[in-house]
Amino acid sequence: MNGTEGPNFYVPFSNKTGVVRSPFEAPQYYLAEPWQFSMLAAYMFLLIVLGFPINFLTLYVTVQHKKLRTPLNYILLNLAVADLFMVFGGFTTTLYTSLHGYFVFGPTGCNLEGFFATLGGEIALWSLVVLAIERYVVVCKPMSNFRFGENHAIMGVAFTWVMALACAAPPLVGWSRYIPQGMQCSCGALYFTLKPEINNESFVIYMFVVHFSIPLIVIFFCYGQLVFTVKEAAAQQQESATTQKAEKEVTRMVIIMVIAFLICWLPYAGVAFYIFTHQGSDFGPIFMTIPAFFAKSSSVYNPVIYIMMNKQFRNCMLTTLCCGKNPLGDDEASTTVSKTETSQVAPA
């Protein structure tokens, strides 16, 4: 074993020299230089500064503008709530622990931080899945005369919470465990050892298949069908400038969605899968830390992609920020979201 395993931690550093200390009791400066911990803290501070205002503003703008309270936006609001969970449940804790160089809140704090960070991340991930399905059903119309309504949105939101809890809760009750990861300043599920006494192998397989591979397949399928449908509609209406514009907008939105999903989650999932399938191999804390912290940036990407690219929401946000006056004019802001729920090609 190239790491040092304790009862509730795994430090990716051999203890042959006797320098390894519990990440709950002492700074981990033998894993990385102090300035590197400071860089992590600065990064988390940046995510808090960017993530909190835009997600909070999303909730506030929706309360202020009644026309935004549509079924589709229920999912977008759920996404904002998930991102706020990550900001308050994970980012603030990680900022504080990074400044100290170790996880100062102990095993109980690690469980709480790991749970809330995982819960927020999973709610966000499954919200993206629900959005993908909603766009597929509305635009591609696999079921004739189906209209995405309030009840469907509520069921979608409930589904995201059920799936998120199904991933975040098991480590709290003995199926796997939350431990400090990478540079030992943030916590996540254990994937470094098999740990048969807590059935860790089965949990990691379950998490990778159900909470990563399946969402990825669903998102690619739905948006692949979406692009195909828009292109087909454009081919049948060559003169339609509206359709041509819709094709470009939807295609651009889909490309950004897929790229952002891969950028945020594929490196983390890939590293976790590699470590899990190469037990005993040599890997350093930086190798584990960078993908995990990069995945956290989804709290900033999400509102930019799924809300800022929504013209109506963007204009309502500008109206709120500019004290009731939209500097871009009122025509675009008056477009209703219901249009996107009945159109075959219009993006959200």
UniProtKB/Swiss-Prot annotation:
Record topology, Extracellular segments:
1-36, 97-110, 174-202, 275-286
Q: Which residues lie on this side of the membrane: Cytoplasmic?
A: 62-73, 134-152, 225-252, 309-348
Tell me where the transmembrane regions lie.
37-61, 74-96, 111-133, 153-173, 203-224, 253-274, 287-308
Predominant location of this chain?
A: membrane
Q: Name the segments for region: Interaction with SAG.
A: 330-348
Q: Where is this motif: 'Ionic lock' involved in activated form stabilization?
A: 134-136
Q: Which residues carry this modification: N-acetylmethionine?
A: M1
Query: What Gene Ontology terms describe what this protein does at the molecular function level?
Result: 11-cis retinal binding; G protein-coupled photoreceptor activity; metal ion binding
Q: Which residues carry this modification: N6-(retinylidene)lysine?
A: K296
Spell out which residues are annotated as carrying Phosphothreonine: T335, T336, T340, T342
Lipid-modified residues of type S-palmitoyl cysteine are C322, C323
List GO terms (cellular component aspect): membrane; photoreceptor disc membrane; photoreceptor inner segment membrane; photoreceptor outer segment membrane; plasma membrane
What GO biological process term is on the record, naming one?
visual perception
Report how it sits in the membrane.
Answer: Multi-pass membrane protein
Modified-residue entries (Phosphoserine), positions: S334, S338, S343
Q: What does this protein do?
A: Photoreceptor required for image-forming vision at low light intensity. Required for photoreceptor cell viability after birth. Light-induced isomerization of 11-cis to all-trans retinal triggers a conformational change that activates signaling via G-proteins. Subsequent receptor phosphorylation mediates displacement of the bound G-protein alpha subunit by the arrestin SAG and terminates signaling.
Q: How would you summarize the oligomeric state and partners of this protein?
A: Homodimer. May form a complex composed of RHO, GRK1 and RCVRN in a Ca(2+)-dependent manner; RCVRN prevents the interaction between GRK1 and RHO. Interacts with GRK1. Interacts (phosphorylated form) with SAG. Interacts with GNAT1. Interacts with GNAT3. SAG and G-proteins compete for a common binding site. Interacts with PRCD; the interaction promotes PRCD stability. Forms a complex with ASAP1 and ARF4. Forms a complex with ASAP1, RAB11A, Rabin8/RAB3IP, ARF4 and RAB11FIP3; the complex regulates Golgi-to-cilia rhodopsin/RHO transport in photoreceptors.
Entry similarity comment: Belongs to the G-protein coupled receptor 1 family. Opsin subfamily.
Instruction: Output this protein's name.
Output: Rhodopsin
